[in-house]
Amino acid sequence: MNFSVIIPARYASSRLPAKLLRDVHGKPLIQLTYENAVNSGANRVIIATDDKRIEVVANDFGAITCMTDGHFTSGTLRIAQVLEKLDINDDEIIVNVQGDEPMLDPSVIDQVVNNLATNPMQIATLCKQITDKAQYFDPNCVKVVFNKIGKALYFSRATIPFFREARDFDLKLCYKHIGVYAYRAGVIKQYLTMNSSSYEKVEKLEQLTALNEGFDIHVAPACASVGHGVDIQRDLDEVRKELG
């Protein structure tokens, strides 16, 4: 199945400045993410960035890059501009892989593409079960709840589902959202005409605007390892430890 991976790569990061260029055993973090994407079934992998420093580093390790404007509030908006610049057909499947997901197994990228192709929902994404109680209470861990057919009901940094009675607490009901999305190019382009929803603004989660606009998002547990996304220094330390 033909599809492209686009990796939105922003230099500025309030919680971990310049994190995509941080060294992980001789390679910048963004290179690890790129190499995993290349090892998927993608026809092409593009790094979309608004910063020359990332462009230079990415070109040095052989990546295709596309410069975008710097004012975008989400990775999807950055990808939408790439699609317009490259005149990509509306029917093409695009996978949005966050630049700070250096341990995402390539098969997971293929999985989310297959999920999009075999479901009627406009967007597909992934999750994994939370097994650590501390992670459930961590606002850096985005939680997702979904119904029996895999349709997302809500994403939040808050503790969802909330257990009113302590005796009912069960991590088997708790899932962490994995920051990889598949959608048709035409769906992504619609983001350019959307206003960020109030929910996105307060939670800082772009997928909440898609839900607010009426898009259906398919969610499924990842079929393979997704490792650590890197949001803070502790995450980066864990990645270095696991890959050391």
UniProtKB/Swiss-Prot annotation:
InterPro entries: Cytidylyl_trans, KdsB, Nucleotide-diphossugar_trans
Protein name: 3-deoxy-manno-octulosonate cytidylyltransferase
Pathway: Nucleotide-sugar biosynthesis; CMP-3-deoxy-D-manno-octulosonate biosynthesis; CMP-3-deoxy-D-manno-octulosonate from 3-deoxy-D-manno-octulosonate and CTP: step 1/1; Bacterial outer membrane biogenesis; lipopolysaccharide biosynthesis
Family in the record: Belongs to the KdsB family.
Source lineage: Bacteria, Pseudomonadati, Pseudomonadota, Gammaproteobacteria, Candidatus Pseudothioglobaceae
GO biological process, one term: CMP-keto-3-deoxy-D-manno-octulosonic acid biosynthetic process
UniProt keyword Transferase, yes or no: yes
Domain of life: Bacteria
GO CC terms, sorted: cytosol
